[in-house]
Amino acid sequence: MKTRELQSCANRLEEFLVTMLASVGRSERRHHGSLYVQGLLLDGERKSIEPLAERLPGGNVQALQQFVGQSPWAWEPVRCLLAQHLQEELLPLAGWIIDDTGFPKQGQESVGVARQYSGTLGKVGNCQVAVGVHLTTESESMPLDWALYLPQAWTEDGERCRKAGIPEKTPFRTKIQLALELIDHLLAWKLSRQPVLADAGYGNNTEFRQGLADRQLHYVLGVESNTAVWEKPTQRVQPRPRAGRGRPRRPYYGGQPRALRDLATALPSEAWRTLTWRQGSQGPQRGRFAACRVQPAHGHVRDKPELEPVWLLMEWPSEAAAPTKYWFSNLPEGVSRRRLVRLAKLRWRVEQNYQQLKEELGLDHYEGRGWQGWHHHVTLVCLAYAFLLLERQRYKKTPIPTLPEARRCLQLVLIRMIGVCPTCHRPAVGRGSLTT
């Protein structure tokens, strides 16, 4: 970068942080918030507060700990403003992704920590789990809001909650309920409605699908192969009253539903088509897909109301012995199979999000134990991630740098802003001086 380009980028970062941190309160808080984000963007293996402060000139560990862990600024307005800003900058929008991620921990004091399943670990382990909602385009995705999952062992222990700073009388909420609350936040922030994308951990849950439909949102959600459906719309049959005494007859469904894997393998070969959903670094990404209308049969044994018909999308790789992936979607009947496939395949971006948030910006490096500190940290990490994403959008030449490459390119800009090398702490002067 030339000196003029460095200064221009530094100005953009400063303006971005001034705007995004306007709601945190007095100037001292805004200063520490800006420093914290700059520290997250700087090179360094650990992004917890102590090593982060060491890389910043005059970095005050106690001041940063107080700002992140105890300062009473509200994180919701910061996330709201960031979400509204990204909606304007990242176009065209494609969907909202719901997913959860784990934060491995030692000990039992960190808020929400428990022995629980984490997709990050791929097993049960000692960790925190957070549900996130991400905005995605065809080429980028970005976390907008977070909810920390609190197991019942936490919500039923008032003293433990008090020590961690969890708001009084916080009820137990499932990940499904947290996900729907996150969606409600986006709607309350007046974001434009987008199709909701998620894996089978959410898609297999009838409450989640119905909650999205009740909010008039479309979805493309993964489901398990053993999910039961009817191939044709089916209604409960009201039996004739029983003559004489005895228990009244219960309504019933005619016929038995089928598991998705049985339905998929019974489809004729002409039902499957090869479609390309994106151009990857290794060439076109293709797969064999079939789609048909079905009626989910969840709850039919318990006399629950019939569910509305949905699209069933299936993927069967040519080298596989059986179909491997399934999705439900309530997109209109006239939607193209290609659009279903493109939306279904966008969910993978969240995996890249989590990897970059953790490896590049220290999403899971926070060592504080409290509720407020955790939410402050993940909010500031989102600001750092968003700025990198927006800077990538400015590149006109191809190939566009990856997000890790963009962060490394930003190092000279950050040195210009802080005035010293974060490694040796010498003034940034001499060849390539950033003080001109």
Please name every model-derived segment.
Residues 129, 349, 353, 376-382:
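Catalytic-loop motifs flanking and including active-site residues across diverse enzymes
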Residues 361-420:
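Basic, amphipathic alpha-helical segments enriched in Lys/Arg and hydrophobic/aromatic residues
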Residues 14, 136-164, 168-172, 224, ...:
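An anionic, glycine-rich sequence signature occurring as long contiguous blocks
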